[in-house]
Amino acid sequence: MSAQRKFKLGRREFLKFVGIGGAAVLFTPLETLAAPYYEGKTITIVVGVGPGGGYDRMARMLQRYLTKHIPGKPTVVIENMPGASSILAANRIYNLAKPDGLTIGAPQRGIPFAQLLKVDGVKFDVTKYAWIGSTAVESTALAVRSDLPYKTFADLQKANTQLILGGTGPGESSVQFAILLKEFLGLNMKMIYYPSSADVMLAIERKEVDGRAGSYSALKPFIDRGLVRPLIRGKASEPGMENLPVDEDLVTDKRGKIFMSMRSAGELIGRPYVAPPRTPPEVMNILREAFAKVIKDPELKKESQKNQMEVQYVSAKDCQNVLNTIFRQPDDVIKEFSKYIKF
């Protein structure tokens, strides 16, 4: 019998074969029909600051859990790209990274203001990023060394000695917080810039500077150690700082209140994560779901509590709502805001 004849199927046999095969296809789980998109791939998170600070620590903590929650279990790596208050990193994600979900940006939360104020070098539109969301609501506080005689913010206002504060650059939201305190609440201070918030804290340890404004979650370990004492905060609050005076409540100048409110809006996107524009919706759904699951992961929550880092998932939609609040300000308000907020 020829090979051709040997394997020839009659109509009845053919239908039986198709029925069996069709049932096999019908009842095969979808995930076995095609490999997950991220299988065998590497995701790079580009952090817009140097190693050691709050943004970097958050990204490295997420790195250890994202692989677990993304189908296909991709490798996740961190790349630090400090410079120009995260503008360099933001430009890279917007213009150079492929929209394939393999490059994620973790810039500072102040980048919307760099765009709002038309800062030189800005080559992005924050409203057109594919937003993943934010991993925290970050409250800002001003803290000074505990060995200094200042017990309250009123003590600082009455001080004859200039306060030397450390920061990572004028585009940092917490630095802008301190600048507005200087302009509208009479804080006598001078700012010195360092490569990262870790370097700022080292400078405080060495008594090179008197304190810093920073996110409360980043300051808390040093508050608990007794190194620094918090004296005033922004509008957003976290457990442990509820009793601190709020900058907006102390200001009598109407414009000052508006500017402080604008700045504090960015705290709702305290740890932003974005992908390049035009990243496919199905890929963005994977990333958003993974980030939301990571933040709820009991192991991550335990680690974040151990490291005294607050985590909270803020959805892409909520981030866009914050951006809408920032960008709908009248031109005259934005123009005057630019006198105080620099990059």
Model-derived features with residue positions:
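Short, polar/charged alpha-helical segment
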Residues: 52-72, 175-183, 222
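An extracytoplasmic/periplasmic, membrane-proximal ligand-sensing/linker region
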Residues: 40, 225, 281-343
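N-terminal secretory signal peptides
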Residues: 1-33
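Ligand-binding pocket segment of bilobal, Venus flytrap-like solute-binding proteins
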Residues: 82, 166-249
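Ligand-binding clamshell of periplasmic/extracellular solute-binding protein-like
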Residues: 62, 84-86, 101-113, 134-136, ...
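Short, well-ordered beta-strand elements
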Residues: 41-50, 76-77, 104, 162-167
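Extracytoplasmic "Venus flytrap"
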Residues: 45-59, 83-85, 166-173
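Hinge/capping helix and adjacent helix->loop/strand transition within the periplasmic-binding protein
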Residues: 92-103, 111-199, 252-257, 268-303
